Amino acid sequence: MVQLGVSPFAVWRNQSDTKLGDTEGSDTKAGQRCYDDLYSDVVNWMQNGWLDYVAPELYFHVGFEVVDYEKILAWWQTNSYGTTLYISHAIYKVNRQPKYAAWSDPSEISRQLDLARSIPEVKGLVFFSSKWLIQNELGVTDLLRDYFFYEPSELPPLSILGNRTPFRDDRLDKN
């Protein structure tokens, strides 16, 4: 099975960019936006059913004044248009963003995962990148294994498979 998807920057458009005449954007003040800066109209692609999944890169902490993780997560929940939604997380920022205290606290990732998992439209989680999972900054990999992924994940039914669940290979070891 092959799926077509993208992992776009978190912000499609800012609602605050009123000069652009777009009220469909998010309550953010991002300097870089998918549509206006990267010429990536992921909303159009989802509306037209051209993607099997979307995994937006929500690489911001909860409460960040420019792009608040919780607000942008809610925006993607509302604006995924039935496209399978996975959320990408910034493991690489843990203990590497001294300007922002949130990233020096491993519970920041816990807060984000709790928020993402509370939304039925979110069908999975992505972590960038495996390099940082191996480095296990502040024990974040242990936290993920011990508190979030202590049992094999349930695979969601996929529309591309007629809403059937894909085959899971149980030979893989979580350690």
Language model features: what each stretch is:
Residues 74-78:
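Short, surface-exposed basic-aromatic patches at helix termini and helix-loop junctions that form
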Residues 39-65, 80-171:
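Substrate-binding cleft of secreted/luminal carbohydrate-active enzymes
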